[in-house]
A protein has these predicted regions:
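ATP-dependent carboxylate-amine ligase
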Residues: 1-36, 45-51, 62-67, 85-88, ...
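Short coil/loop residues immediately preceding or within conserved phosphate-binding loops
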Residues: 2, 105-107, 260
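Beta-strand->loop->alpha-helix junctions that form or flank phosphate-binding loops
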Residues: 52-55, 93-98, 137-140, 236-258, ...
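Short, polar loop motifs at secondary-structure junctions
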Residues: 34-37, 55-57, 73-74, 223-227, ...
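Phosphate-binding loop of NTP-binding sites
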Residues: 21-24, 45, 59-62, 71, ...
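Acidic-glycine-rich active-site phosphate/pyrophosphate-binding loop
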Residues: 255-271
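Generic beta-sheet signal
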Residues: 32, 54, 93, 137, ...
């Protein structure tokens, strides 16, 4: 078979990462996407990968040895129809990874509704810090590295394990293909309403991956998460270690600061050390503990894992500070699920105390656009002082009820247990320029520091740079 691989949908982070790995394995790699754009296009071209914009079937003539089909591709796409009609050899990204790379490596997979990218980046960095030169494929760009994917020089391979479906011809979750030796299950909630009818359907996929973890491997998960407990109750053939607050948990963390920027690490009830780092929030504490546990099982000494975590930098788009102008700090975060929104805001609130927080949200994920989480959205934003919602064209539901719920009129009845006033001023905008003007006005209207937290899993029309320029 020809060593030429052609990737359909190459500019996504996952498929672009596969392109980089295939190139490093010695394949000739080409690919196409509907829109070829930086930064992924730049990364790929620097690797010597030829990119084609659009899906004209001529790109498949002469036929490559293998077509790797991204999960965004569907029937009716000209390249897909040509590929099927000509009976070209094709596979999915996860299946190709399994057959050509993961079979020969010790795989550490980070799964869960939230925290996959950050946890995978933490594990990869701790292994790197320990001199183990791991390979990795991560859905964001870890700031401790210069790329989102690399082959690595060691035995270990760290992968962000996504439960989204594999391809138009394989509706199993991607992670079912990864053959993990160590599986991290961070959490589990209902998400991806476009492909999963209910939580049970997602749990079924999680149990499929649990079934593939060998008996000499490891499964890591938090205590007291009923949705994960139910997955394990369906059958588990692998040693299980849990993170929790109970003394009988294998792993425990004790916060030394409310914002979780310092915490003690306990293993089997014994103090192993203290993490002091630049991240905040209970969600990041849990991500970090999972990473320490996974790295320790891979052979990293606990003191070295703790030191490595202390030197970890959050991946881009995870509470990433984009800039600060006259005491107004602008953050970018990938949060797009009510739980992630709430935990991100709670972490920021713990860090900044009573300083003003303006939360800006674009409901862009498929699940959010369908309105699946609309009932929980207002509650998830309660830690912010101001909430500005972007109503993009094509959103299937109206954001006004969320804004109405946030606009509490009686200030005396709206203080939460932490003493933070939850009498919100919420607004909805349909145009980016109007949204930026409103953020600017609100941020400058108050004396003292202000924190603008922008949350979206998309580009949000470049709002961060535009806002900083306006400020």
């Amino acid at each position: 078979m020809s060593k030429h691989i052609h990737i359909l949908g190459i500019c996504g982070t996952f498929m672009g990462g596969i392109a980089v790995l295939a190139k490093q394995l010695g394949y000739k790699v080409t690919g196409s996407d509907a829109n070829v754009y930086p930064p992924m296009s730049t990364q790929l071209e620097e690797q010597g990968i030829e990119l084609i914009e659009g899906y004209d079937p001529s790109q498949l003539d002469p036929a490559p040895g293998m077509v790797i089909v991204g999960n965004a591709m569907s029937r009716g796409n000209p390249c897909i129809e040509y590929m099927l009609n000509r009976k070209l050899a094709y596979t999915s990204g996860p299946q190709w990874l399994s057959e050509h790379l993961l079979q020969h490596r010790y795989v550490i997979a980070a799964s869960g509704t939230h925290g996959k990218t950050t946890t995978a980046a933490m594990v990869a960095w701790i292994l790197e810090y320990a001199g183990l030169e791991p390979g990795f494929l991560i859905g964001g760009v870890p700031q401790n590295f210069t790329e989102s994917a690399r082959l690595g020089g060691g035995y270990f391979f760290v992968i962000e394990a996504d439960e989204y479906d594999t391809a138009f011809f394989d509706k199993r979750s991607k992670f079912v293909h990864y053959q993990p030796n160590t599986l991290i299950m961070n959490n589990l909630e209902y998400d991806h309403a476009d492909i999963f009818p209910n939580l049970s359907a997602i749990q079924r996929q999680f149990h499929h991956v649990v079934r593939t973890v060998p008996s000499n491997g490891l499964i890591l998960m938090p205590d007291n998460v009923p949705a994960l407990d139910e997955v394990i109750q369906q059958g588990c053939w692998t040693p299980l270690q849990c993170l929790g607050t109970e003394h009988n948990s294998h792993w425990q963390a004790k916060k030394l600061r409310d914002d979780a920027s310092q915490f003690e690490v306990y293993c089997k009830g014994k103090l192993a050390g203290v993490v002091k780092w630049g991240l905040i929030g209970d969600h990041n504490l849990q991500n970090g503990m999972m990473a320490i546990a996974a790295a320790h099982y891979a052979g990293v000494e606990l003191n070295q894992a703790i030191a490595g975590l202390g030197a970890f930098k959050t991946p881009k788009r995870r509470m990433e500070v984009k800039g600060e102008v006259q005491g107004i700090r602008v953050y970018d975060d990938f949060a797009h699920h009510p739980t992630a929104i709430a935990t991100t805001l709670a972490g920021l609130r713990a860090a900044v105390g009573s300083e003003r927080i303006i939360a800006v949200l674009e409901p862009r994920s498929n699940t959010m656009r369908m309105g699946t989480h609309q009932q929980a959205l207002a509650q998830s934003l309660m830690q912010a002082d101001d909430v500005l919602l972007y109503q993009p064209a094509g959103l299937d539901w109206n954001l006004q009820p969320v804004a109405d719920e946030l606009c509490v009129t009686n200030r005396s009845d709206s203080t939460n247990e932490s003493g933070i006033d939850n009498s919100h001023k919420a607004a909805i905008h349909q145009h980016i320029n109007d949204l930026i003007s409103d953020i600017t006005m609100r941020a400058k209207a108050q004396s003292g520091p202000c924190h603008v937290l922008i949350m979206s899993n998309g580009g949000f029309a470049g709002i961060h740079d535009k806002l900083l320029a306006e400020l």
